[in-house]
Amino acid sequence: DTGYARVPLVCQSCIYDLGFGSASVRPDAAMGYEACEDAKANHPRSGNTGAGCGATVGKLCGMERASKSGLGIYAVRLGRLEMAAVVVVNALGDIFDPESGKKIAGLRSEDGSGFADTREELYKLSKRTDMFTGNTTIGAVITNGKFSKAEMNKIASMTRNAYARCINPVGTLADGDTIYAASVGDVEADINVAGTLAAQVMERAIANAIHAL
C-alpha cells in the first residue's frame, strides 16, 4: 500500500507516478499492445508520452511545487559506433540543460513565478526529514558496440555521469535512480569512447525529456 493505491511488486523498474493525476487510471494489456503498434509505425517521441506521462521533478516541497517532466530519447553515430539513450526523468532535484547550464525544470518558487533552488532548500533542513521518496530516474543506453557483460556494466556506470551533470541534487536517499546498458551489435570499439559517448547521449536525452513537453 503506497498511500495512493496498492501496487504489485512484480516489475524490474518503474517510476512512482500515482501521486500525479488519478491513481485509479491503470494501463492494461490492450493499451500495451497499442503502444507497441504505435512505436513501430512512428518515430520515437520524447516528452509527455509513454512512461513519461506521469513523470515530475523538483518534489522536495511536495507535488504542488513540482514541475512536469517526461520521456527523453537521443541517439548519435560516431564512425560505425552507434549509441542511443532513453530515460524517464522523475527526480527529486532540478534539471539543467547540459549545453547551456540553464535550469529547465524543477522546484517552483512559492508564488509560482519561477524556479526555486532545490539544493538551497535542502540545506535549510536542520534535522532528519521524511522526504517524498517516489523519485526514480530510469534510463537505458543501447549500442551496436561489441562488449562483454562486465564492460557493459562499466559503460552503465560511466553513463551515470549524465545524471550528475543534468540533475541537482541527485542520488539522494529519496531517489531510486537506475541505468541499464545493452549491446545489440558486433562493432569493435574502445570502452572508454563508448562510455563517454553514452554519458553525452544520456545528457541530451534528459534535456529532451523537458524540451519536448
Predicted regions and their residues:
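A structural signal for small-residue-enriched, beta-sheet-centric alpha/beta enzyme cores
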Residues: 1-213
